[in-house]
């Protein structure tokens, strides 16, 4: 039976992610901060919620920045929400925070004056929204284009390499909702909270061989 390591650095909705993975039959799901267990896992999930400065402080304290770079190279790897944002170069949150740098680009604030067709939009962006599939990817298997996923975020990803953008969202402005590069896949939304389509994405991740 394959193992899926859910990285625990004290800043994630770990149990809901783990339960969703177990629900789709992903294998033996381990919530862990043990680097040895993470290195030995067949697949790795990197969730995250909260302030990016606090997240990156814990990631660096535990040495997980280098560990994430290592394990995401040679096996299926999934970043979720702030776990996705931590994979970018830098976030402007909290006055500016350097991140892990696996995907080129910046994490930017939606702003206080966000509008759509004359209507003021509340920040954070919270609730269901469509994701446009920019390119075909194994993790989109059996998920229709413009499927709705659940988002909770005040900061969005401005990707520097548009070829890595495999899913796009829109909330007053366009943003990267999903990024992919090799065996790495990352989403701004919460698949574990996104009902049928979110569970399908996790099932696809559990079956994915990491090639793209």
UniProtKB/Swiss-Prot annotation:
Coiled coil location: none
Enzyme Commission number, as recorded: 4.3.2.10, 3.5.1.2
Domain of life: Bacteria
Keywords on record: Amino-acid biosynthesis, Cytoplasm, Glutamine amidotransferase, Histidine biosynthesis, Hydrolase, Lyase
InterPro entries cross-referenced by the UniProt entry: Class_I_gatase-like, GATASE, Imidazole-glycPsynth_HisH
Main location: cytoplasm
Active site feature: 81 (nucleophile), 190, 192
UniProt subcellular location: Cytoplasm
Glutamine amidotransferase type-1 domain residues: 3-212
Gene Ontology biological process terms, A to Z: L-histidine biosynthetic process
Reactions catalysed: 5-[(5-phospho-1-deoxy-D-ribulos-1-ylimino)methylamino]-1-(5-phospho-beta-D-ribosyl)imidazole-4-carboxamide + L-glutamine = D-erythro-1-(imidazol-4-yl)glycerol 3-phosphate + 5-amino-1-(5-phospho-beta-D-ribosyl)imidazole-4-carboxamide + L-glutamate + H(+); L-glutamine + H2O = L-glutamate + NH4(+)
GO molecular function: glutaminase activity; imidazoleglycerol-phosphate synthase activity; lyase activity
GO-annotated cellular components: cytoplasm
KW Phosphoprotein (keyword) present: no
Pathway: Amino-acid biosynthesis; L-histidine biosynthesis; L-histidine from 5-phospho-alpha-D-ribose 1-diphosphate: step 5/9
Keyword Coiled coil: no
Classification via NCBIfam families: IMP_synth_hisH
Subunit structure: Heterodimer of HisH and HisF.
Main function: IGPS catalyzes the conversion of PRFAR and glutamine to IGP, AICAR and glutamate. The HisH subunit catalyzes the hydrolysis of glutamine to glutamate and ammonia as part of the synthesis of IGP and AICAR. The resulting ammonia molecule is channeled to the active site of HisF.
Protein name according to UniProt: Imidazole glycerol phosphate synthase subunit HisH
Species, as recorded: Pseudomonas syringae pv. tomato (strain ATCC BAA-871 / DC3000)
Lineage: Bacteria, Pseudomonadati, Pseudomonadota, Gammaproteobacteria, Pseudomonadales
Gene of this entry: hisH
């Amino acid at each position: 039976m394959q193992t899926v390591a859910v990285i625990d650095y004290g800043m994630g909705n770990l149990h809901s992610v783990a339960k969703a993975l177990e629900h789709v039959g992903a294998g033996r799901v381990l919530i862990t901060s043990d680097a040895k267990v993470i290195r030995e896992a067949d697949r790795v999930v990197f969730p995250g919620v909260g302030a990016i400065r606090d997240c990156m402080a814990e990631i660096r304290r535990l040495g997980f920045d280098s560990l994430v770079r290592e394990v995401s190279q040679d096996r299926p790897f999934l970043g979720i929400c702030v776990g996705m944002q931590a994979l970018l170069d830098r976030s402007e949150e909290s006055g500016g925070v350097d991140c892990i740098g696996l995907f080129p680009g910046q994490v930017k604030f939606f702003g206080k004056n966000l509008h759509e067709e004359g209507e003021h939009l509340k920040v954070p962006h919270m609730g269901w929204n469509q994701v446009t599939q920019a390119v075909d990817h194994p993790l989109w298997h059996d998920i229709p284009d413009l499927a709705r996923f659940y988002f909770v975020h005040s900061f969005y990803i401005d990707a520097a390499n548009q070829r890595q953008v495999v899913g796009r969202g829109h909330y007053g402005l366009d943003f990267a909702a999903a990024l992919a590069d090799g065996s790495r896949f990352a989403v701004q939304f919460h698949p574990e909270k996104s009902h049928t389509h979110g569970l399908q994405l996790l099932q696809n991740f559990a079956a994915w061989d990491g090639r793209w």
